[in-house]
Structure formats: structure tokens, C-alpha cells
Amino acid sequence: MVVTILLSFLGVADKVPDTETIPVGLRKMKEVGLYNVILEIDLGNSTYDFNKFTVDKCCLLLENWIQWCYDNLNKNAKILINFRDIPDAMATGAVRVFQVVDFLCKLSASEGLFGLIFEEPRGKSLPEECGTWAKYIRKIMDDHKWKGHLLIHVHEKFGYSDATALQVNTCTRGR
């Protein structure tokens, strides 16, 4: 069983997250013995003020929660990181996305992350857009020789979800 822990809305004040309080979802997972986790993060401009909460601070927060999962849930936990707002993030902060992916790839060498997910939450992005995002994310992963999983979560709308999944598969095939 995998439990999703949403990092993007945890104690956000003035568009800066609470970096000290352990998310309630992680604490509950520990109580009941669950350990496979999807940590979700927003990288677009709507949730955080990245002038106050820098990409480096975001990466350190992810690293802290990942380490917390290994230390407190299970040393063999399968942890996925989900970029919840990839269309917004790629439109306004693609470099930010690539910085976080690069950081996670380097971290995965020692931490053994299971993989990455990116989400198209509105079902409005064209399959070619999602395919391009997947291609560049996978390229960063490949450049680091990280064989972690790359998954996509597309919400249904306008019939793009199936076409998008096929396009992403095509853009990352052979990797």
C-alpha cells in the first residue's frame, strides 16, 4: 500500500512551508506500519514564493522528509516524488523543475528513491507537451545513470489522458 503525503499545503504561511513539523500523514503512517510513500510537491508559482523559499531550501526539505521516511518508516521504503503542478511549473519555472530533478537524481544514488511522477492535474495539456516534459526529465535521470521509475498521472478531460500516456511512453522508450 502506498500513502500519498502532500507537502505542498503543509503549514504554508506567506507562501513559505513549515519545514519543522513532521507531516501528519507521515506520523499516521508510522503509527499503522505503512512505509511506501508518494511525497507530493508543487513547483509552480501559485503555492510557494521561491524568492523566500528557494529551490535549494525546497530540495533540503524533500531530503529531510525522505530521510525521515527511511529512518522512521522502513529503510527499504519505496518513495516516489510527485510533481503535482507540472504544467504550471514548466510554463513559469522549468529551470526550477530541472534543478529539483537533478537534485533528486544525485540524492537517489545514496537514498535509493523508487522514482518520480509528474501530474497533469487538469487534463488540458497536449500529449506532445507531456511527452516533451517526460523526455527532458528522463534525460536528466539518464545523465545521472539513475534507473528510477518515471510515471505520469493524467486527469481525464477532453480524451487526452490515453493519448498522453501513449505519447509519454513513446518519448521515453528505449531508456
Model segments located where?
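Short, surface-exposed acidic/glycine-rich loop or hinge patches that mediate macromolecular interfaces
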Residues: 124, 157-159
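Structural beta-sheet core signal
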Residues: 5, 10-12, 39, 81, ...
